[in-house]
Amino acid sequence: MCLLLAGCSEKPPVVLAPEKGPELLSCTPENGTTGITGKELTVTLIFDQNVKCPTAQQKNVTVDNGATVAKVNAFNEKVTVNIASLEENGKTYTLVIPKGTISGFKEHQDSADEIRFSFTMKLVEPYVPSELDPVKSLVNPNASQQAKNVYNFLLEQSGKKTLSGVQSSHSHKNDFVDAVYKHTGKHPALAGYDFLFLQFSPTPDNWSWVQNYNDISAPKEQWAAGGLVNYMWHWNVPNSKADWDNGVNNYNFDGYAFYCDQTSFDIREALKPGTWQNDFIMKDIEEVAGYIQLLEDEGIPVIWRPLHEAAGNYDLYGPNGAWFWWGRHGAEPCKQLWRLLYDQLVNVYGLDNLIWVWTVDVTKGAEDQYMDWYPGNEYVDILGVDIYETNTDAKTRQYQALVDLTKGQKLVTVSECGNIPDPAKCMDAGNKWSWFMVWCNSDSNGNIVLTPSDANFKLNTSDYWKKVISSPYVMNREDMPDLSF
């Protein structure tokens, strides 16, 4: 009887409550983040202690809207969840990690509470390539009749034929035009000239290689023969203020350049009235206006391509920035300079014979920055791209990037090239290049070299030149109608 009483007096064992589970301290990105881009996302969770997520539990981690959980990993106090198969559709996705999935390492410890993490993807409309449908008029409402004639002709030829073109070797001669004729029996439809030697015009007697821009016999000859005239401007500026001070009296300073690594000239200062840099560019613009006026007086329209290649290399080749001083300090000053140049030449100096061509760089990846640098539809008539590549492909990537830039509102052209894009390939691809302009090369004696050894040019063999010039998809000077009326 006593033993029975003793057994009934025993106390039940004590059951301890589990210790609180791991607590979530932070989440990256934060819960509720919007504008997520890409097809994958890594969510990083930080807890207040070391945690684990056994393989058997990882299958319980889910995400909705068709996305998938690719991987879950726990290490020390951090858990990462890799989410895949996301779409930039504007939808909100929710990641769920049920209670019991993540736990600590202590005995008699509860698991972490359920975690719900939501994020919203950026809405990106599906890419639809733009079709070329250029506007029917020039940006200058007072454009000369001859300029209108040229533009209307380019519109008519778009998608039918590409005009042949070459850049002269000495900036103001027809030597390359004549060399192509001598070799193929046809003259290029478009001849390119350059205000490269502006600071040395008129030509000093002892500098035979410098051009006299008052002598417009070369463009007059080209226009009179039915060809078109293109001018660009490798805009030389003083290397330093000292060079400007030393040369300002005779305007023939020795220290000049257009490459960024050769001049400290600052476009931002040039846009400020009252600075010596502004004084310089305004004098240059005035001088160029005078030379263009000579052409307008002769009824010669000018396909005008200043500030070419916009930003140069768009920093895609490294930290050195743009090639040319007009792109060194970013998009905004460059756009301002373009608009200033347009305003001065058109509105101040009253030049109505210009067709404005804005040029981009061909570098892959630069397409995403074109719009940042574009001065606006109201300042540009035609879009160009300078292409130096080791093939004769149709250049579809570059073509579509230009067309997309203005949703097809502007004609597009290969404004410079080495190896000529094959006209047949271009037509087969539906690439409606308005013209191509082959850059000039010459030997040490100044003779034109049609097939340089450089890989970007050497496919322009003797036979290929003849093939291109005789192509049914190419228009040469001999094929041009009279546009001088």
Regions picked out by a protein language model, each given a short descriptive name:
Residues 166-167, 305-307, 338-368, 410-419:
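Aromatic-lined carbohydrate-recognition surfaces of secreted/lumenal glycan-active proteins
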Residues 4-7:
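C-terminal motif of bacterial Sec signal peptides marking the signal peptidase cleavage site
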Residues 163-168, 410-485:
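Substrate-binding cleft of secreted/luminal carbohydrate-active enzymes
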Residues 39-72, 100-103:
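Short, surface-exposed alpha-helix to beta-strand junction/turn motifs within ectodomains of secreted
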Residues 13-33, 99-126:
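Acidic, Ser/Thr/Gly/Pro-rich low-complexity segments and short DxT(G/T)-type signature motifs
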Residues 193, 370-392, 439:
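Aromatic- and acid-rich polysaccharide-binding/catalytic face
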Residues 123-196, 200-212, 424-425, 479-485:
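N-terminal module-boundary/linker segments of secreted carbohydrate-active enzymes
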